[in-house]
Amino acid sequence: MLASAAALSACGGTGTDAVPTPGATTASDDPRAMQTIVVWRAHVDTLALRVAQLDSAAVALRTDGDVPRVKSAFVEARRAFKLSELALEYYTPTTAKEMNGPALPEVDDEEGPEAVFPPTGFQVIEEALYGDAPVSEREAITRETGTLRPLVTRAQTMMGAQHASDAHVWDAVKLELARIATLGLPGFDSPVAGHSLAEADAALEGVVRTLAPYHAADSTWSRVDSLLADVRAMLNATTDRETFDHFAFLSQRLIPLGQAMQQVRLSMAIGVPAELRPFRMDAATVFDSAAFDAMGFAPIDARPGTPEQIALGERLFHDTQLSGDGTRACSSCHVPEK
């Protein structure tokens, strides 16, 4: 799961806040895709409103009696973010990371180890607001809510100029399902408040609204509708992530949903973007046996290995002569069968 999450971090639409170039198999400004863009813009506008309300509540935080109001505003802002998440992560991944990245300092590889940047966004607010003494963290909370507001404004500007294709809309949905499975359900972005199940449901509501322009009354869609209802019912049956049956949810609900959505996309003859990335464009789910492409991690000018190079790599993987004392190989720890 961790490996999938790491690979997914490299899979957001463009990698930077820019408009993806539609591939040869897609057409930009597809009518249904542009209807979806309108939905996404409305979601981001709602996010801006909720973040402004959160900021106002945080500024008014003075006593313990004010904490529930701030927490309520935080929950609403987070729900608005989750509704917008698939679009923000796909088209403005840099901004999305600033809004919802982990509450950990970050080192810039290009700047060197001395360039350490503090975390920002929702997760920083969450740690302060859901800690032991949120009132004493008022300055930190208001600093972050004040940071969120221009980030959302930036996202509004970028989404206002956005174009889309059917292929990119469906790709964004597929990535969101993978994000729910690998980052949402495990509690990666709700580590303290523990709201991951409710937020996963909000993210799925974003998926439902995103695909509404494509919906049709036929058997392929009825399968998707049924699975979506089952998925959301299971998420809403409990708020306790620790007792939630993650395996059953993934194997019996979310993976079949991804597969059913793939069938709907194919039935509508919607292609996939032409970009190369670790999570294969034509994979139905992140759990497919061939979901990941090693070339997605390679330099842009790299070429696939030849059979001879692959065979050499396999021999070196098991060769103990490469270790200092000649007793260990890569396969000593990394057992391919496991």
Model-derived features: where do they sit?
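Bacterial N-terminal signal peptides
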Residues: 1-9
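The canonical Cys-X-X-Cys-His
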Residues: 77, 316-337
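Solvent-exposed helix-loop boundary motif
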Residues: 231, 337-338
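Electron-transfer interface patches adjacent to heme c in soluble/periplasmic c-type cytochromes
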Residues: 287, 291-302, 324-328, 338
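Bacterial signal peptide processing site
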Residues: 11-15
